[in-house]
Amino acid sequence: MATLLCDLQERSAKVERARHWDSKQGSSNSDVASGGSEVAGNSGNNSYLGDDVGWKIYPYRFLQLLQHLEQLQFTIQAPRHARLGISTVRMWSLRPYYNYDSYLEKDLIQPDVPHDSLIWALLRYVGRAVDRWVSRTFQPPRIRPLHANDPPAEASL
């Protein structure tokens, strides 16, 4: 990750030097913005950042994304056949860059293998039953509203 970050910083420095050189020559980078040959990445040594279009146009965005990803702690997803729970995929910290909800709907809740869907249905059923039992068993005591004919609290002591 660190070498990739250094490589990106070096490439973005090349972009700035090339832009400075272009401004000295009196040309603008309109061909980059309008989709010229340099955007396609086939202009040889004249291309700023190689073949990747995104690095050419927005190098600082990729640097920001890499620096952010470097600070995150997340678990890589398990193989499809080994997934038994949502805890195997922890992508909440990537939420700005990754649509977690659609991932759950498409990939985890509706697996490809039929027996996996049976396991998921069983897990959901057991989870709901446990939730109902816990909510019934450990309910906080209900506080009765005071009525006019109730004795004052001091009298009960």
From Swiss-Prot:
Organism: Alternaria alternata (Alternaria rot fungus)
Chain residue ranges for the region called Disordered: 17-43
Induction: Expression is up-regulated more than 10 fold in toxin producing cultures.
Keywords: Virulence
Note: Gene clusters encoding host-selective toxins (HSTs) are localized on conditionally dispensable chromosomes (CDCs), also called supernumerary chromosomes, where they are present in multiple copies. The CDCs are not essential for saprophytic growth but controls host-selective pathogenicity.
Organism lineage string: Eukaryota, Fungi, Dikarya, Ascomycota, Pezizomycotina
Biochemical pathway: Mycotoxin biosynthesis
Domain of life: Eukaryota
Cell inner membrane among keywords: no
Known role: Part of the gene clusters that mediate the biosynthesis of AM-toxins, host-selective toxins (HSTs) causing Alternaria blotch on apple, a worldwide distributed disease. AM-toxins are cyclic depsipeptides containing the 3 residues 2-hydroxy-isovaleric acid (2-HIV), dehydroalanine, L-alanine which are common for all 3 AM-toxins I to III. The fourth precursor is L-alpha-amino-methoxyphenyl-valeric acid (L-Amv) for AM-toxin I, L-alpha-amino-phenyl-valeric acid (L-Apv) for AM-toxin II, and L-alpha-amino-hydroxyphenyl-valeric acid (L-Ahv) for AM-toxin III.
Keyword Ribonucleoprotein (UniProt): no
Listed name of the protein: AM-toxin biosynthesis protein 15
